[in-house]
Amino acid sequence: MAAPVSGRRMAYRASLALTMYCCSTGERLRFAMAPSPSARLINATRLVSIFFPNLCIESMESFRRRANPAAFFDPSLALSMILCACGRLIGLMPSPAMGWFIFPVSSLPSV
């Protein structure tokens, strides 16, 4: 039987799932920019998903195994996550949106 998951790990996993949703849909969520601990965690995991997509793939795979131990790793899932993360990185580099991850919330442009 698996060990119980702590609240902090659960929040981290939930923010990773939200990160992958944001990367796959290209959405920018306003609440993710709020100056709260949970929002900072979301921003951190968004950075992780952009620069280290394999970490997100491993995390999402662990979700699937817990939900269904017989689940197998789907290569198309890995490929789509990598492509989404790379597309997000390329899309952010030349735009002021990159500042969203670097500068304080008060300096964010309105969308």
Swiss-Prot record:
Record protein name field? Putative protein p34
UniProt source species: Acyrthosiphon pisum secondary endosymbiont phage 1 (Bacteriophage APSE-1)
